């Protein structure tokens, strides 16, 4: 499979504009440098995989990247693979999530026929337990659908030729502290960073290696 940049949006696509993105009730904090870098990469590769440990913020970052670039695509489809346990069913589950009818038990073919030359961004979230199946489906779709781009999240890369794998870094000290404070305020609205507690907050974030989920869980215990 050859490497090429995603094409410009097409107005002739029959696959109408829909942005099926998850809704988060908390504010996205920081990651300005990461968003800038990923904005460059998503415009230069057709398969971008965000990798990293659980809780590192892959899903949230993917959501923000997709939302920021919604105008590039006729459609954005988001598929959470976490509930899928059978690798054989991945094509059917993806088709179902995208509201594409399973045509005679051939879900992969139905995906190809429906997406066709649509300018689409497909987000495959939580691929790690289905890496081989996700890689096979992604490669099949990319080969058959020339205007399709895929943004994946996984604890490990899919291993497809021309894939760009990008390791999500931990939050920096200031961003980690800001996240802690905002999440702590959900349970204790009066909480704020002060000269008295700032050292302790930063120490907690450092001990948690800047992992967003771990910081959020710790902040939720503030009373």
What does each model-identified segment do?
Residues 1-223:
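Aliphatic-rich helical/repeat scaffold segments used for oligomerization and domain docking
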């Amino acid at each position: 499979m050859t490497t090429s940049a995603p094409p410009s949006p097409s107005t002739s696509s029959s696959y109408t504009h829909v942005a099926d993105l998850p809704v988060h009730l908390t504010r996205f904090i920081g990651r300005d440098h990461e968003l800038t870098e990923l904005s460059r990469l998503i415009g230069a590769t057709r398969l971008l995989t965000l990798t990293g440990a659980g809780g590192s913020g892959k899903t949230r970052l993917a959501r923000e990247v997709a939302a920021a670039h919604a105008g590039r695509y006729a459609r954005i489809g988001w598929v959470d693979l976490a509930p899928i346990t059978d690798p054989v069913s991945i094509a059917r589950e993806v088709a179902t999530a995208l509201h594409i009818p399973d045509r005679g038990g051939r879900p992969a073919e139905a995906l190809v026929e429906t997406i066709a030359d649509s300018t689409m961004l497909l987000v495959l979230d939580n691929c790690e337990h289905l890496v081989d199946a996700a890689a096979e489906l992604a490669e099949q779709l990319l080969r058959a659908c020339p205007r399709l781009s895929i943004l994946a999240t996984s604890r490990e890369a899919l291993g497809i030729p021309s894939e760009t794998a990008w390791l999500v870094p931990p939050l920096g000290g200031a961003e980690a502290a800001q996240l802690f404070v905002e999440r702590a305020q959900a349970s204790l609205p009066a909480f704020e960073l002060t000269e008295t507690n700032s050292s302790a907050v930063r120490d907690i974030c450092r001990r948690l290696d800047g992992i967003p989920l771990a910081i959020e869980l710790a902040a939720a215990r503030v009373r």
